[in-house]
């Protein structure tokens, strides 16, 4: 277990992934992300559930797959500048790490659950530390959760009290955007509100929807004295379709965050798990509200 990728693969599989000669003690964070990204491209079979061939997500006003630059009608948005290409690369790196986390579910450590059956797990990630993973079963189609949580992040503050605001700073291409997010205070006010700037990559696959992201810098939102600027490691939202029942789905939230400030680690961990459960309560209420108005 001194290697980056050792989740049940034999020697040849690890060699194929390009990870055999990368012990954790000798690689940098950038090398780790590059290796994970390369593994996801060269060996998709190690992600049996998270990765499948399918159509990519595209925003309502654009068409995925176009090679043209953004025109007056908003079709075919793609990264052009070096900064935009760097953002796309960051998004792909975050997506690769999230897919690795999903592929290692047998290594998730159970932490706690609530009275409706939602469970929080943790997993130690190289260079990013403890990652929290919430897994919940939902009595609604995957498309509904995708619409509310992944497709419309800027509207989440309307129903999710754990978030004070979300603003789309830039749509980089049909799969990548940069968002500015404000997280509400937690732990009874002991943890004050934090703000984040994240790059997000969204993909729509045959059996799931995925939004993966991580912290980035953007000229549109430099750090402000009003908030402590937090920093997210690779994480995101996953909505898994049911192969047998289209009216239910599984929701997974992967959270790796550094809230900064001088907070005791135990308090941070307690507040993160509580926030994840609270988010699920708000999400279920949102789904009920939507169904009652249809």
UniProtKB/Swiss-Prot annotation:
- Major place of residence: membrane
Matches recorded under InterPro entries: MENTAL (IPR019498), StAR-like (IPR000799), STARD3 (IPR051869), STARD3_MLN64_C (IPR029867), START-like_dom_sf (IPR023393), START_lipid-bd_dom (IPR002913)
**Catalyzed reactions per annotation:** cholesterol(in) = cholesterol(out)
Classification via SUPFAM superfamilies: Bet v1-like
Record Pfam families: START
Query: Where would one find the signal peptide in this protein?
Result: none
Sorted alphabetically, which keywords does the UniProt record give?
Answer: Endosome, Lipid transport, Lipid-binding, Membrane, Phosphoprotein, Transmembrane, Transport
Which post-translational modifications are recorded for this protein?
A: Phosphorylated. Phosphorylation allows the tethering of two membranes that participates in the formation of ER-endosome contacts. Phosphorylation of FFAT motif drives membrane tethering between the endoplasmic reticulum and late endosomes that in turn allows the efficient transport of sterol mediated by the START domain.
User: From its record, what is one biological process in GO terms?
Assistant: vesicle tethering to endoplasmic reticulum
- Can the keyword Transport be found in this entry's annotation? yes
Q: Where in the cell is it found?
A: Late endosome membrane
Q: Does this entry carry the keyword 4Fe-4S?
A: no
Q: Where is motif FFAT found?
A: 55-61
Recorded GO MF terms = cholesterol binding; cholesterol transfer activity; protein homodimerization activity
User: What range(s) does the START domain occupy?
Assistant: 79-292
Q: Which GO terms describe its cellular component?
A: endoplasmic reticulum membrane; endoplasmic reticulum-endosome membrane contact site; late endosome membrane; lysosomal membrane; organelle membrane contact site
Describe the protein's quaternary organization and the partners it interacts with. Answer: Homodimer.
| Name of this protein | StAR-related lipid transfer protein 3
Provenance organism? Salvelinus fontinalis
Query: What does the organism's lineage look like at the top?
Result: Eukaryota, Metazoa, Chordata, Craniata, Vertebrata
Report the gene name.
stard3
